[in-house]
Amino acid sequence: MSEAKRRAAEKAIEYVENDMIIGVGTGSTVAYFIDALGHTPKRIKGAVSSSEQSTAHLKQHGIEVLELNHTGTLPLYVDGADECDPYKRLIKGGGASLTREKIIAEASKQFICIIDPNKQVATLGKFPLPIEVIPMARSLVARQIMARTDGQPVWREGVITDNGNVILDVHHLCITDPVKLEQELNQIPGVVCVGLFARRCADLVIIGSEPPHIL
C-alpha cells in the first residue's frame, strides 16, 4: 500500500500553489505528502501542523511551521484518514492527533483527504472510532458511550496526545448517521474531540489507485 499512499500524496501536490500557507495533517500517507512538498519546485510560505511528529518532518525539509493563531483562514488542508465513506465523511485519529486535525480542517477553505484504496468503506465504523478525552473523565466517558451506543470503548493505554489527554477507541460501531453521532458524543462531559469528520467532511478525496481517483 505504500505506493498507493505515495500516488495519493503526490497527486495532492497539484493543489498546492506558490506562496500558500497550508495545513498539514498526520500519518503515514501525510508523510509522503510532506516528502513531496520538500521536493516540489513550488515554494509555500509555511505550514500549520497538526502534530509534533509532522512539525519535525516539515522542519527536516526546511518548511517553516506557523501557529494557526497567527495565520487566519488557510486556503488548503491535506490529511489522511482511517476510513472514508462515499460521502467523504471520515474516521480519523488513529495517530491520536484528531483534535488538532479537526481544528485545522475547520480553519481551512479546502480540505483534501489522501488515502489508499483500502480506506474506502460503505459505512463508517469498522475501524474503531477514536475519541480524545480529559484523563479524569475517562471512565465516565466510557460509561456514557456504552449507554448511548452499541460500541465498546477501549482505553488506548500508554498513549498521551499532544494536548495531554487520553484516547478511547470505540469498537463495534455501525455508523449510519455520522453527523448525529458526532454531535451526540461531543455532548458528553470530558470529551475533547470525536474522530468523526462528518459535519466538516473532506471537500475532495484523492484515492491512490493506479491512476489516482478523485472522489
From Swiss-Prot:
* Assembly description: Homodimer.
Q: Which UniProt keywords apply?
A: Isomerase
- For the keyword Isomerase, the answer is yes
Positions annotated to bind substrate: T26, G27, S28, T29, D79, G80, A81, D82, K92, G93, G94, G95, K119
Report the InterPro entries cross-referenced here: NagB/RpiA_transferase-like, Ribose5P_isomerase_typA_subgr, Ribose5P_isomerase_type_A
What gene makes this protein? rpiA
Q: Which organism is it from?
A: Xylella fastidiosa (strain Temecula1 / ATCC 700964)
> Transmembrane ranges?
none
Q: Which Pfam families match?
A: Rib_5-P_isom_A (PF06026)
Full protein name: Ribose-5-phosphate isomerase A
List of catalytic residues: E101 (proton acceptor)
Question: What is the similarity comment for this entry?
Answer: Belongs to the ribose 5-phosphate isomerase family.
| Gene Ontology CC: one annotated term | cytosol
